[in-house]
């Protein structure tokens, strides 16, 4: 069987069932459930506390009219974080490396925030396309530039997380391959293994940061289009 550098991004199957589907279903055992035996579980208590703190900080700069977005933004953050971290396991598929999936999250959420602004405060939303104090000859050019900047926001959200995760996975793939190839030279192989360990820690941080950045940018777009 011929393997290439990009085979790690193909979705593995077992008995024609995608392994990602099985792994996502198994996650339900660690999510909070209304069961007396699990109400005092330490892991669930820590999860609930962390989710509460994150949601509180996320909604802090957003007006009260946008607080009903708390559940969907927190759920999106949890989904992205779980997918990113699971993708670091060997022989797994990371769905968030696919631009189509990330755009599927980014485009509807961005469009929803934009439509909220146009519905509730159309004047303020359109005013963002023209900075205050712009000279008259520059008005058409600046409106065009700001419009393009507005339209590429969902693309930037999707490309950012896909590019960062793909680059990190390729680095880990190359480093792990080098570790195995240098097994005949123990010193170099050990040094490469240490580098792989450090790179794995870095990629775990990147996985968490990218999920956080994705949701934070969406919250900023929501803040721009909601009123007090």
Swiss-Prot record:
Record text on subunit structure and interactions:
Component of the ATP synthase complex composed at least of ATP5F1A/subunit alpha, ATP5F1B/subunit beta, ATP5MC1/subunit c (homooctomer), MT-ATP6/subunit a, MT-ATP8/subunit 8, ATP5ME/subunit e, ATP5MF/subunit f, ATP5MG/subunit g, ATP5MK/subunit k, ATP5MJ/subunit j, ATP5F1C/subunit gamma, ATP5F1D/subunit delta, ATP5F1E/subunit epsilon, ATP5PF/subunit F6, ATP5PB/subunit b, ATP5PD/subunit d, ATP5PO/subunit OSCP.
Signal peptide span: none
Q: Which domain of life is it from?
A: Eukaryota
- Reaction(s) this enzyme catalyzes, per UniProt: H(+)(in) = H(+)(out)
- Cellular compartments annotated: Mitochondrion inner membrane
One MF term in the entry's GO annotations: proton channel activity
Main location class: mitochondrion
Protein name as annotated: ATP synthase F(0) complex subunit a
Sorted alphabetically, the keyword list is:
ATP synthesis, CF(0), Hydrogen ion transport, Ion transport, Membrane, Mitochondrion, Mitochondrion inner membrane, Transmembrane, Transmembrane helix, Transport
Q: Which residues cross the membrane?
A: 13-33, 69-89, 98-118, 139-159, 194-214
Q: What does this protein do?
A: Subunit a, of the mitochondrial membrane ATP synthase complex (F(1)F(0) ATP synthase or Complex V) that produces ATP from ADP in the presence of a proton gradient across the membrane which is generated by electron transport complexes of the respiratory chain. ATP synthase complex consist of a soluble F(1) head domain - the catalytic core - and a membrane F(1) domain - the membrane proton channel. These two domains are linked by a central stalk rotating inside the F(1) region and a stationary peripheral stalk.
Family to which this protein belongs: Belongs to the ATPase A chain family.
Disulfide bond: is it a keyword of this entry? no
Q: Which InterPro entries match?
A: ATP_synth_F0_asu, ATP_synth_F0_asu_bact/mt, F0_ATP_A_sf
Q: Which gene encodes it?
A: MT-ATP6
GO CC terms on record?
Answer: mitochondrial inner membrane; proton-transporting ATP synthase complex
Keyword Kinase carried by entry: no
| Membrane-topology descriptor | Multi-pass membrane protein
GO terms classed as biological process? proton motive force-driven ATP synthesis; proton transmembrane transport
Please give the Pfam families that the UniProt record associates with this protein.
ATP-synt_A
**Gene source species:** Pelomedusa subrufa
């Amino acid at each position: 069987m011929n393997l290439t550098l990009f085979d790690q991004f193909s979705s593995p199957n077992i008995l024609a069932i995608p392994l990602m589907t099985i792994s996502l279903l198994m996650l339900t055992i660690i999510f909070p459930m209304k069961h007396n035996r699990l109400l005092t579980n330490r892991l669930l208590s820590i999860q609930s506390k962390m989710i509460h703190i994150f949601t509180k900080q996320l909604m802090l700069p957003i007006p009260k009219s946008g607080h009903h977005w708390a559940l969907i933004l927190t759920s999106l953050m949890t989904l992205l974080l779980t997918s990113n971290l699971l993708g670091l396991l060997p022989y797994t598929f990371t769905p968030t490396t696919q631009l189509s999936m990330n755009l599927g999250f980014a485009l509807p959420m961005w469009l929803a925030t934009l439509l909220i602004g146009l519905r509730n405060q159309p004047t303020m939303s359109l005013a963002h396309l023209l900075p205050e104090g712009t000279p008259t000859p520059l008005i058409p050019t600046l409106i065009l530039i700001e419009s393009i900047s507005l339209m590429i926001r969902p693309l930037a959200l999707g490309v950012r997380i896909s590019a960062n995760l793909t680059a990190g996975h390729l680095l880990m793939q190359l480093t792990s391959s080098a570790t195995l190839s240098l097994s005949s030279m123990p010193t170099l192989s050990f040094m490469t293994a240490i580098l792989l360990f450090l790179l794995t820690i870095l990629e775990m941080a990147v996985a968490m940061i990218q999920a956080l950045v994705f949701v934070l940018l969406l919250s900023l777009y929501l803040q721009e289009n909601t009123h007090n």
